[in-house]
Amino acid sequence: MIKTYVVTHLRKMEEGIPEGLQVVDLPMTSEERTQVRRRLETPSGLVLNLALPTGTVLQPGQILCVVEGVAYRVVAAPEEVLVIYPRSLKEAAQVGHLIGNLHRPIDLSGEVIAILYDAALEERLRNLGLVVVREMRSFAKTPLPGHSH
């Protein structure tokens, strides 16, 4: 018999993981972390039916739920990204301008900018003379203030 658990709310990130619990990581791509109304099967076969509020975005490190002494934690799954290595402030500004105009999410880590893979965007970045490397790695978009048109 398949066990099913319905997830309707999330623990606060600052609550952390209670001591004594086993932790099971649930790898999810950045797109999957926005799909909060779906069926998710854990490695042990437990089915989690996500029924979270519209607009919820799951964050890496967040505890999705605790069931029978097991904490299910969201982790960023490796996915195809473009990693841009700006060599100057001017190059970083060019990247920011181009990606910002396209309203694409970015992952800022250290001195590099990562974006989800897009062949046309890769070509545009290379045509600007930027150092761009295609990699498989986790992508956790950096929360930045937004605006609307």
From Swiss-Prot:
Coiled coil: none annotated. Keywords: Chaperone, Cytoplasm, Nickel. GO terms for molecular function: nickel cation binding; unfolded protein binding. The keyword Cytoplasm applies. InterPro entries: UreE, UreE_C_dom, UreE_N, UreE_N_sf. Belongs to the UreE family. This is Urease accessory protein UreE. It comes from Synechococcus sp. (strain JA-3-3Ab).
